[in-house]
């Protein structure tokens, strides 16, 4: 009506100006009238969106089979319980104040799906209609199928107390108010990635090392975002949808798969830049000094990203990830402790020596080896090189320069970092170690702390009096760390397997020095730490057709591997040269002078641990023993594993890394993947050291009369390594992490048993031979 009236009025008024004015006035009046009409009419109009006129029924399958899962399997679920859809209505006015009121309807489902026979470890990913869902956006409760699992509270609330089953022995999930709008207001087709480890290996894991230590934000349990440009931001530490951050996803899965886990060694890296001890600086580094836009600033030891040194490049990207920010390490410590686990802080040195470096080589090369092992840091020139500094006062001076002058009192803690108040250019080993000790204290303390690992080239350096200056520094650091962290933190050093038991210089002198005994006996040291990468086999492909001299029937013979833990190479015999290894010319390990072959047997832990130690200068045994007290402290394996590669037990200490001089595959290996190699290696160690093992021999791991525990503390066998980058993002996302192809060190036999999915409806495949497949058995 307003349209007609105002149109006529506009035409009349515009007619004063002639026909054109009348037309314009009519149009203007019509528009104004239309607006008034719409406001009057729409203000009372009510529009309703689509609404379900009836239930969309979905049914359970009567008599459906219940699968039994082995390994990692993607399965659909069977509906076992549901309610009617919940309907919610939302009314709001559209447009301006005079717009219509619109009511929209949303629907939510409450349902339970049976998965498989329990007990499973857990569920990793979930798909709805083939698309992975973000677990942060939905409420899903997972029941693993134990025989004592409780009734779900939602089912009990709907069915009434005492009327709801717990579905014990059945793994199932409950969806609580699952939004259906994205699925056409229907229940989508769900699939679940179910984890159920095979065998007992995962249940025996009580300690792991958590890597990578080189990741600027990867250890943060909080979501870190980076804004590259206005309106364009992405997560820096979340590459999966089944947890809020990469670290959370990794720790969730670790605890699912290893129910008896107690200890996590948190690896955190600073970088060395030179193999010459006197020139080497150890400092935090970043992947790029121009990185910006992060929701949390990167700071380490008071150094910001713009002031830090960037790691070198290898190929098309950084050779390493950067040092974890101080704040991320403190947060990671708190997160791990909040999960009921104990933290061992593991300060780690990686060597950033680029392939195109021109640094003088202490070992006599034209340049230093690219990206070397930290155990190569030594004097300049190195021992047994012409003009060596070893066994001179220059060795002590170079070690002193390497360690620096930092004092434990020169650190100040803030909420996000630990500041160093000493000389700004002091990037010595003492600053590095004491920084982490103060960081641990700022995070509320840790259960254990390592004051170093595998610094063999430094611990064996001697001064002019045949003293070991770096060992003295480690002793002093142990005392400092004890003051910082208190009596409740265990302290040790992770010695290389070829380092822990003594130093036997290959110079024909006959010298034997138990060079680390001053450290092992030190009152601030609680355990003897060993990175155990001792070989357990000597298998070649030719042994398939001829007898293996060690009685192995196959490359990973279970009995043979177990016997070799205290036998074989490094115990009964050794190879005097690589040529001798090729020809299998074995030399027996003996001690004709004093009848103590354990002195030379790096595998004879019982002999080394149970006896007093006497140095031999020039081959003559000293009259007095070292400071070591027999059976006085437990042994921890601060690292233990063999790579998941063909013939891994032949040489467990090597891993492929194309950029590094250390890159190698085990002796006589094809380089192909073998998860079975790692599995059998770990099983052999578990049977040998664990008193609960059926074939345990008490003499292999005796009890100390001094502290009442076993020689090797089973709870402190730290397996190397569990990755904080969760599967499947790592190793598949090579656009994010360049080392995805080098993941042979990951604990594959704990993390996965995957390659193909096998369905067995006719035969029972529960035998121990099921190792590398994901299987489903239907009953």
Regions flagged by a language model, labelled:
Residues 101-119, 232-259, 312-329, 430-432, ...:
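Short linear interaction motifs
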Residues 647-762:
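Aromatic-rich peripheral "rim/lid" segments of glycoside hydrolase catalytic domains that contact
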């Amino acid at each position: 009506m307003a349209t007609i009236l105002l149109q006529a009025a506009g035409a009349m008024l515009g007619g004063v100006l002639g026909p054109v004015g009348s037309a314009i006035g009519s149009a203007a009046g019509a528009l104004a009238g239309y607006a008034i009409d719409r406001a009057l009419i729409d203000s009372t109009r009510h529009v309703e969106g689509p609404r379900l006129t009836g239930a969309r029924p979905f049914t359970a399958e009567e008599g459906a089979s219940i699968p039994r899962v082995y390994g990692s399997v993607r399965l659909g679920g069977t509906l076992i319980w549901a309610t009617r859809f919940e309907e919610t209505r939302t009314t709001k006015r559209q447009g301006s104040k005079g717009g219509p009121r619109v009511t929209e309807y949303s629907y939510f489902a409450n349902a339970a799906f049976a998965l498989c026979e329990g007990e499973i470890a857990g569920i990793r990913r979930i798909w709805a209609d083939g698309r992975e869902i973000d677990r942060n956006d939905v409420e899903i409760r997972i029941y693993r199928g134990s025989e004592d699992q409780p009734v779900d509270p939602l089912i009990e609330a709907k069915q009434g107390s005492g009327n709801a089953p717990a579905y014990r022995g059945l793994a199932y999930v409950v969806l609580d108010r699952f939004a259906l709008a994205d699925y056409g207001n229907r229940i989508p087709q769900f699939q679940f990635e179910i984890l159920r480890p095979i065998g007992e290996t995962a249940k025996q894991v009580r300690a792991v090392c958590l890597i990578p230590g080189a990741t600027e934000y990867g250890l943060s349990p909080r979501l870190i975002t980076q804004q590259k440009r206005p309106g364009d931001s992405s997560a820096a530490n979340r590459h999966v949808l089944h947890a809020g951050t990469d670290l959370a996803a990794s720790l969730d899965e670790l605890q699912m798969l290893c129910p008896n886990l107690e200890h996590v060694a948190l690896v955190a890296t600073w970088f060395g830049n030179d193999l010459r001890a006197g020139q080497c600086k150890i400092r935090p580094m970043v992947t790029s000094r121009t990185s910006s836009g992060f929701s949390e600033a990167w700071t380490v030891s008071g150094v910001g990203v713009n002031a830090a040194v960037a790691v070198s490049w290898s190929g098309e990207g950084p050779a390493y990830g950067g040092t974890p920010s101080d704040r991320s390490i403190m947060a990671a410590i708190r997160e791990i402790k909040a999960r009921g686990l104990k933290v061992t802080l593991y300060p780690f040195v990686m060597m950033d020596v680029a392939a195109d470096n021109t640094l003088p080589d202490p070992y006599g090369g034209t340049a230093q080896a690219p990206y070397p092992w930290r155990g190569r840091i030594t004097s300049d020139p190195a021992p047994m090189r012409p003009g060596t500094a070893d066994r001179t006062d220059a060795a002590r001076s170079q070690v002193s320069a390497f360690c620096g002058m930092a004092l434990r009192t020169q650190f100040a803690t803030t909420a996000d970092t630990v500041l160093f108040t000493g000389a700004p250019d002091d990037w010595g080993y003492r600053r590095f170690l004491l920084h982490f000790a103060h960081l641990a204290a700022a995070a509320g303390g840790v259960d254990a702390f390592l004051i170093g690992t595998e610094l063999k080239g430094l611990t064996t350096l001697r001064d002019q009096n045949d003293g070991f200056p770096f060992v003295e520094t480690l002793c002093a650091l142990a005392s400092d760390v004890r003051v910082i962290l208190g009596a409740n933190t265990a302290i040790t050093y992770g010695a290389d397997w070829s380092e822990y038991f003594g130093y036997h210089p290959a110079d024909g002198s006959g010298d034997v020095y138990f060079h680390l005994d001053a450290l092992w006996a030190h009152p601030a040291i609680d355990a003897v730490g060993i990175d155990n990468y001792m070989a357990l086999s000597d298998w070649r492909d030719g042994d398939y057709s001829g007898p293996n001299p060690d009685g192995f029937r196959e490359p990973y013979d279970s009995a043979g591997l177990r016997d070799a833990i205290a036998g074989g190479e490094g115990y009964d015999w050794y190879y005097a040269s690589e040529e001798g290894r090729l020809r299998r010319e074995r030399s027996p390990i003996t001690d004709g002078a004093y009848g103590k072959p354990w002195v030379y047997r790096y595998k004879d832990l019982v002999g080394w641990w149970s006896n007093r130690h006497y140095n031999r200068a020039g081959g003559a045994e000293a009259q007095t023993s070292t400071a070591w007290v027999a059976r006085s402290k437990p042994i921890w394996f601060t690292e233990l594993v063999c790579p998941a590669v063909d013939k891994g037990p032949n040489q467990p200490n090597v891993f492929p890394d194309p950029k590094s001089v250390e890159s190698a595959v085990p002796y006589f290996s094809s380089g192909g993947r073998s998860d079975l190699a790692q599995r059998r290696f770990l099983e052999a160690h578990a049977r040998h050291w664990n008193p609960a093992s059926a074939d345990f021999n008490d003499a292999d791991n005796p009890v100390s009369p001094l502290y009442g525990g076993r020689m090797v503390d089973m709870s402190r066998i730290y397996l190397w390594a569990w990755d904080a980058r969760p599967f499947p993002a790592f190793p598949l996302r090579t656009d994010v992490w360049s080392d995805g192809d080098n993941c042979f060190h990951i604990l594959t036999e704990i993390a996965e048993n995957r390659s193909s999915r096998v369905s067995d409806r006719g035969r029972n495949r529960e035998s121990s031979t099921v190792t590398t497949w994901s299987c489903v058995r239907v009953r």
